């Protein structure tokens, strides 16, 4: 398996799209292996596998900084940062790996101890300000789900990012869900953006002063790489709005998104993934 050999995101750099998709499939299997034995967040992680692979392919962590909101969707990130054993081994191996981002566990790649909703943008603006004071040039990327956007601290973070006016990338992982369905005025605009492929007249993010990119195919690695490449090294506050499917790749989690948000251990048969005989660079 590729993921048994990946020790850092740099190991993705020489892979072509076919191989990256195999890596994504292996990660999905590994996530299911862990949650089936240990319990944990199912749907949020499965829906963000491809985006995580694309983010780590395009950006250069640990120089570039990722901040995960709640961080319940960070399992794929952990697999790609040298912690695959916590997803492939037995329960004792899994107990070593937290279900959330943890600097104590991996200070190089986990920037904050997180577990609450709506915090990622404000935390990222702290990194943004510190970078600007130091005169550095790393990318700061906040990842937040549509469900977390209704939290007050998310509003504060958007306000501060816009006020600072320098480079920050906010990836809005829009799966049309929080734990359950979303309700409220924000979600009417998100729906209008989805239905218009990001082109509707009233754009909540542009009103805040953000550059804005929309991607309908939020579980397509090739398309994700293209949109992330287009905003890499930006010097402006930028939102990348991706439409994903919660539970993607696991039919029970897609069929019942609320039930499969988090789960106790369940029966799951781990399957191997066919690998190509050669690896070609994506270029």
Predicted regions and their residues:
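N-terminal amphipathic, basic-rich helices that act as targeting or association modules
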Residues: 1-81, 204-207, 212-224, 238-241
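Short hydrophobic/aromatic-rich motifs at helix boundaries and adjacent loops
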Residues: 23-26, 95-100, 200
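Residue-level signal for pocket-adjacent positions within structured domains
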Residues: 1, 7-10, 37, 86, ...
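Glycine-rich ThDP/TPP pyrophosphate-binding loop and its adjacent helix/strand module
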Residues: 110-282
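Non-transmembrane, interaction-prone segments in cytosolic or luminal domains
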Residues: 8, 74-81, 85-87, 96, ...
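Generic structural signal of hydrophobic/aromatic residues within well-ordered alpha-helices
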Residues: 2, 6, 31, 75-79, ...
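Solvent-exposed, non-transmembrane amphipathic alpha-helical segments
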Residues: 40, 47, 71, 75, ...
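Cofactor-binding active-site loop characterized by glycine-rich and histidine/acidic residues
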Residues: 41-164, 282-283
């Amino acid at each position: 398996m590729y993921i048994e050999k990946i020790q850092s995101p740099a190991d993705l750099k020489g892979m072509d799209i076919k191989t990256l998709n195999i890596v994504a499939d292996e990660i999905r299997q590994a996530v299911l292996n862990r949650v089936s034995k240990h319990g944990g967040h199912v749907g949020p992680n499965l829906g963000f596998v491809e985006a995580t692979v694309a983010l780590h392919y395009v950006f250069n962590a640990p120089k570039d900084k990722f901040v995960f909101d709640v961080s319940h969707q960070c399992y794929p990130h952990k697999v790609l940062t040298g912690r695959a054993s916590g997803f492939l081994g037995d329960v004792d191996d899994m107990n070593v790996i937290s279900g959330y981002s943890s600097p104590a566990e991996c200070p190089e790649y986990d920037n904050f101890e997180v577990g609450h909703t709506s915090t990622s943008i404000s935390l990222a603006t702290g990194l943004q300000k510190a970078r600007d004071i130091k005169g550095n040039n790393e990318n700061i990327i906040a990842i937040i789900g549509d469900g977390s956007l209704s939290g007050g601290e998310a509003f504060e973070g958007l306000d501060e990012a816009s006020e600072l006016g320098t480079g920050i990338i906010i990836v809005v992982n829009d799966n049309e869900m929080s734990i359950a369905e979303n309700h409220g005025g924000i979600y009417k605009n998100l729906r209008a953006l989805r239905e218009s492929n990001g082109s509707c007249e009233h754009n909540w993010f542009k009103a805040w002063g953000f550059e804005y990119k929309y991607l309908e195919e939020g579980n397509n690695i090739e398309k994700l790489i293209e949109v992330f490449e287009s905003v890499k090294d930006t010097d402006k506050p930028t939102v990348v709005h991706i439409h994903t499917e919660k539970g993607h790749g696991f039919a029970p989690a897609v069929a019942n998104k609320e039930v499969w948000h988090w789960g106790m251990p369940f029966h799951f048969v781990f399957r191997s993934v066919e690998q190509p005989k050669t690896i070609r660079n994506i270029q």
